[in-house]
Amino acid sequence: MNDHKPPIEEFMGLSFNMSTVLMTTIACLIVFLITFIGTRRLSMNPSGLQNFLEWVVDFIRGIIKANMDWKVGGRFIVLAYALLFYVFVANMLGLPFELYNPTTHEVWWKSPTSDPVLTLTMAAFVVILTHYYGIKIQGFGKYLKGYITPVPFLLPFKIIEEFANTLTLGMRLFGNVYAKEILMILLVTAGTSGLIGMFGAFLPLIVWQAFGLFIGAIQAYIFAMLAMVYMAHKVESH
């Protein structure tokens, strides 16, 4: 298990984890296809996939309304939908199994969110968007004034908070998904070590997969919810 490593490719002096690139692409395609198929033939009496997607949208609408006024927050429903759905699918991809090259020991099929580079990039993207919409909605002057309100002494702490938000948002997702996959690999390794190991690891593996489903769903919710919390802090006056 310890010999497993990511497939790294160099391009223009930069290193790319090709497993993360592959699995991110697959997760995006799954989200796109489900959304496209579910909304291709909209009906006033929804059923099946359309009914499920409408439930997801209503759930996301509730997250936004809990954090900001809908007149302001309504524009972020597509962003929240994409974050929630993508993170959930990405978390689930490594749940049933992992695939690796037995010759090179490179892991190809896994949850892309078990890569800290991806989760921190997503977190940075969210934080940058909050600044963009904060300036767009409030105006540059009023937005900057928020950093010295109610007292200018808070300025350095609010700057530190921006970096802390990025770090915690990304590392929380990475840490939970990575721990889930590490324990799953341990159980699979034990299950393939022999007949006794197979029977001993079977039930814990099933239980942990069920718990992994719960972890993946909760982390997707937390990521989307915190994204809307950070957005509300920037676009609404306090």
Swiss-Prot record:
It comes from the Bacteria. Coiled coil: none annotated. It is found in: Cell membrane. Keywords: ATP synthesis, Cell membrane, CF(0), Hydrogen ion transport, Ion transport, Membrane, Transmembrane, Transmembrane helix, Transport. The chain crosses the membrane at residues 18-38, 76-96, 117-137, 195-215, 216-236. One of its GO terms (cellular component) is plasma membrane. SUPFAM superfamilies: F1F0 ATP synthase subunit A. One of its GO terms (molecular function) is proton-transporting ATP synthase activity, rotational mechanism. It is a multi-pass membrane protein. InterPro entries: ATP_syn_F0_a_bact/chloroplast, ATP_synth_F0_asu, ATP_synth_F0_asu_AS, F0_ATP_A_sf. GO terms for biological process: proton motive force-driven plasma membrane ATP synthesis. Its main location: membrane. Belongs to the ATPase A chain family. F-type ATPases have 2 components, CF(1) - the catalytic core - and CF(0) - the membrane proton channel. CF(1) has five subunits: alpha(3), beta(3), gamma(1), delta(1), epsilon(1). CF(0) has three main subunits: a(1), b(2) and c(9-12). The alpha and beta chains form an alternating ring which encloses part of the gamma chain. CF(1) is attached to CF(0) by a central stalk formed by the gamma and epsilon chains, while a peripheral stalk is formed by the delta and b chains. Key component of the proton channel; it plays a direct role in the translocation of protons across the membrane. HAMAP family: ATP_synth_a_bact (MF_01393). This is ATP synthase subunit a. The lineage of its organism: Bacteria, Bacillati, Bacillota, Bacilli, Bacillales.
